[in-house]
């Protein structure tokens, strides 16, 4: 299916790499690099839990470890190259429907690719806008990790005002008809995650149509997505 349906709405389908089915998914998935910045003991526990297993822990630079020497960046890039040996395209030209269960309830989401041409952090009235001021001092480390990186493990979370629940919930209601991708416990009592592949032209067209309706209802200079987390990523 052509991505023309998604032109101008800020997100598009993508290819998403996932670990092989027999991998330790609990060890693979860790929290974002900007969490637990004042709790190095949390990251020490995660490091012990992960050990030598493949993990996104090795692909990020926790902010509690800043400043980082150049060799730390080199090690992250080496870990990314190693990870390519255990990852495969879980979804091609599609989305991932996500369900995360925590102690406070259930959250639904849609993993997608973000059109960065629709985002600015300098106060411009773009389709995608930040929710906090960008701290320039936090950017160099992120840029160093991305410079020459063979993988991207972004933790950006976009918020969408959809009071009628027209984008994600229809997919979730028929999740039994979608191909399951993963179903596992998250580390450190962080809850449980399940994911399903969204790849059919019918489903992608429905997503695009719903987002376009929301955008059209906003009038001039629409704010369709707010960056709820990952403003610096």
Annotated model-derived regions:
Residues 1-191, 195-202, 212-222:
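N-terminal extension/subdomain marker
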Residues 223-233:
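A sequence-level detector for short glycine-anchored, His/Arg-bearing signature motifs
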Residues 206:
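Catalytic-face loop-and-helix region of soluble metabolic enzyme cores
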């Amino acid at each position: 299916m052509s991505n023309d349906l998604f032109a101008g709405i800020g997100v598009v389908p993508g290819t998403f790499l996932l670990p092989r089915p027999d991998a330790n998914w609990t060890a693979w998935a860790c929290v974002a690099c900007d969490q637990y910045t004042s709790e190095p003991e949390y990251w020490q526990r995660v490091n012990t839990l992960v050990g030598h297993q493949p993990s996104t822990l090795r692909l990020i630079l926790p902010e509690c470890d800043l400043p980082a020497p150049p060799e730390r960046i080199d090690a992250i890039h080496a870990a990314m190259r190693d990870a390519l040996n255990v990852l495969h395209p879980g979804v091609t030209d599609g989305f991932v429907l996500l369900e995360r269960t925590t102690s406070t309830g259930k959250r639904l989401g849609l993993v997608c690719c973000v059109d960065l041409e629709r985002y600015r952090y300098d106060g411009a009235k773009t389709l995608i806008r930040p929710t906090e001021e960008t701290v320039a001092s936090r950017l160099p480390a992120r840029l160093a990790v991305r410079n020459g990186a063979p993988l991207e493990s972004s933790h950006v979370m976009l918020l969408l005002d959809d009071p009628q629940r027209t984008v994600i919930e229809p997919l979730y209601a028929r999740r039994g008809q979608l191909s399951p991708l993963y179903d596992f416990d998250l580390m450190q009592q962080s809850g449980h995650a399940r994911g399903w592949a969204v790849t059919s032209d019918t489903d992608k067209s429905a997503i695009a149509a719903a987002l376009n309706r929301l955008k059209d209802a906003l009038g001039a200079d629409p704010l369709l997505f707010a960056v709820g987390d990952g403003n610096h990523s």
